[in-house]
Swiss-Prot record:
Cited PANTHER family: MITOCHONDRIAL RIBOSOME-ASSOCIATED GTPASE 1 (PTHR45782:SF4)
Keyword Ribosomal protein: no
GO terms under cellular component: cytoplasm
Record-given protein name: Ribosome biogenesis GTPase A
Organism: Geobacillus sp. (strain WCH70)
This protein's encoding gene: rbgA
Length: 283
């Protein structure tokens, strides 16, 4: 399958420009990634866009990711001199660490301000960046403690930018995520589709399910057996589709397996943790 998907709505090009304009107002950036696919959910231009602005990497949806793998990712980012935290904006895991980690990172800057005689330094100003559907709005709501940002499960739901107070110590600028103009890497697109970061209408659903099942077969075979009551996992991917389809009653007239329906079921099960905590990338 050839993948050169143009998925770069006009508001994203604008967001990139706006992020670079707003960096002048910002003390620190929170780079929000999906803990299950930290590299695939990362904008490849992020270093160029953010320059040397202080940054904390937040591995969101960590409660859905394989804990052992998430620990490896935290170590990976630390080796790159990037402080990383495992969080889950939906459940609240790790949220309290965010403000204290930012304070720690900015303490020298604010100490200098105090030394200059600024008695009541302003709140830290932070910017959250991330691709669509990685949980930016949910994180803002969690940090602000009230329902401000519009959240939804449809990618690209956040459009406008706004400042939001987080207690007395921080102000947050919410900005729509930035996704690269095209996926050079086919696997990146498939991972984003598997986790629901891009709309199901963008890629062929069966292609995504084939990718996901091949991955699960290799890395989480016992979960597959348990979820779909399989005695063993067939070698051929079509046979695996057939086995799941028969177990789940996904049949069309004449008794053939409905592969689209099987694809929907498998992807829904992945996204709703019916197969447990999964990570689709390791460092």
């Amino acid at each position: 399958m050839h993948m050169t998907i143009q998925w770069f709505p006009g508001h994203m090009a604008k967001a990139k420009r706006e992020v670079q304009e707003k960096l002048k107002l910002i003390d620190i950036v929170f780079e929000l990634l999906d803990a299950r696919i930290p590299l695939s959910s990362r904008n490849p231009m992020i270093h160029e866009i953010l320059g040397n602005k202080p940054r904390i990497v937040l591995l969101n949806k960590a409660d859905m990711a394989d804990e052992t793998v998430t620990e490896q990712w935290i170590a990976y980012f630390e080796r790159q001199q990037l402080h990383a935290l495992a969080i889950d904006a939906q459940t609240g895991t790790g949220i309290r660490q965010i403000v204290s980690a930012a304070k720690e990172m900015l303490k020298d800057k604010f100490a200098k301000m105090a030394a200059k005689g600024i008695k009541n330094p302003r709140p830290m100003r932070a910017l959250i960046v991330g691709i669509p559907n990685v949980g930016k709005s949910t994180l803002i709501n969690r940090l602000a403690g009230r329902n401000i940002a519009k959240t939804g499960d449809k990618p690209g739901v956040t459009k406008a930018q706004q400042w939001i107070k987080v207690g007395k110590e921080m102000e947050l600028l919410d900005t729509p995520g930035i996704l690269w103009p095209k996926f050079e890497d086919e696997e990146v697109g498939l991972k984003l589709a598997t986790t629901g970061a891009i709309k199901d209408t963008i890629l062929n659903l069966q292609d995504v399910a084939v990718y996901a099942l091949n991955f699960l077969k290799q890395h989480y075979p016992e979960r597959l057996k348990e979820r779909y009551s399989l005695d063993d996992i067939p070698g051929e991917i079509v046979a695996l589709f057939d086995a799941i389809g028969k177990r789940r009653g996904c049949l069309v007239s004449g008794g053939a397996v409905d592969y689209d329906k099987v694809s929907e079921i498998v992807l829904h099960d992945i996204r709703t943790e019916k197969l447990g905590r999964l990570s689709f990338e390791t460092p």
